[in-house]
């Protein structure tokens, strides 16, 4: 993909995500690993730091002039960020709680944001050895150890049971209120950005997120949902989520659904 003076080879980004996943698995497969709590009480492990360092180094080698915003470098000021037209937005380890629980439902997320929209997204699930890829103007795809397939969202048909994906770690009253509006539904619990990817590949119709998330939690999978024919919309304005438009890096509540 050509972005102004930058030629982006998505295969290189896939390789970066997989390399970060391998680094995470080295720590995941140890008998024990260190973790601590950040200021917001979210967990931080040595795997988060190792993956962050690897991704930052590799992206700086591939695109030395494109800035990088990571969950682990979120202290970068709005005064600096608002000058960015194009930047990498990464979550080195999304689903740290799932990582600590050792249920395998965590991901590496790398997105390229251009003019506030996610135009490239790679989500890699190291334990599952599955990778989802979205690139603006091209079909979304899912890569496994067996094959690579084009993926598409699945529209809901009248009378059909809604398949709704929800957070394994953050389900709450807001989700229950949302579900009351649906006549028939089946709830699928999942961790990390895999939830958005399930909508992208047609395994779920909806993912309502009516609780706090940050921009690095959604950007990569958002690009994949877009490429698969879906959308990620603000629950209040019904407009697509945008990135780096304000001082706060918090997302509004949102819904992931087919177009």
Predicted features and spans:
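Glycine-rich active-site/cofactor-binding loop and its immediate structural neighborhood
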Residues: 84-128
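Oxyanion/phosphate-interacting regions
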Residues: 1-15, 21, 177-181, 196-259
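Conserved beta-strand termini and adjacent loop/short-helix elements that scaffold enzyme active sites
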Residues: 71, 167, 190, 233-235
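Residue-level signal for inorganic ion chemistry
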Residues: 24, 48, 59, 96, ...
């Amino acid at each position: 993909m050509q972005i102004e003076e930058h030629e982006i080879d998505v295969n290189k980004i896939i390789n970066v995500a997989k390399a970060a996943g391998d680094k995470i698995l080295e720590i995941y497969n140890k008998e024990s690993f260190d973790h601590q709590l950040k200021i917001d009480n979210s967990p931080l492990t040595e795997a988060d730091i190792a993956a962050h360092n690897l991704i930052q180094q590799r992206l700086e080698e591939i695109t030395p002039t494109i800035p990088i915003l990571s969950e682990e470098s979120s202290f970068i000021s709005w005064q600096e960020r608002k000058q960015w037209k194009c930047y990498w937005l990464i979550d080195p380890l999304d689903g740290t709680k799932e990582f600590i629980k050792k249920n395998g439902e965590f991901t590496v997320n790398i997105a390229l944001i251009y003019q506030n929209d996610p135009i490239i997204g790679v989500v890699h699930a190291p334990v599952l050895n599955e990778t989802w890829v979205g690139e603006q103007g091209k079909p979304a795809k899912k890569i496994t150890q067996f094959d690579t397939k084009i993926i598409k969202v699945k529209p809901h048909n009248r009378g059909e049971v809604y398949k709704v994906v929800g957070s394994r770690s953050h389900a709450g009253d807001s989700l229950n209120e949302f579900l009351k509006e649906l006549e028939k539904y089946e709830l699928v619990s999942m961790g990390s950005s895999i939830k958005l990817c399930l909508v992208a590949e047609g395994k779920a119709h909806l993912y309502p997120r009516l609780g706090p998330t940050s921009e690095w939690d959604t950007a990569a999978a958002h690009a994949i949902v877009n490429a698969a024919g879906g959308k990620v919309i603000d629950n209040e304005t019904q407009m697509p989520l945008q990135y780096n438009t304000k001082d706060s890096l918090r997302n509004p509540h949102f819904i992931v659904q087919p177009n």
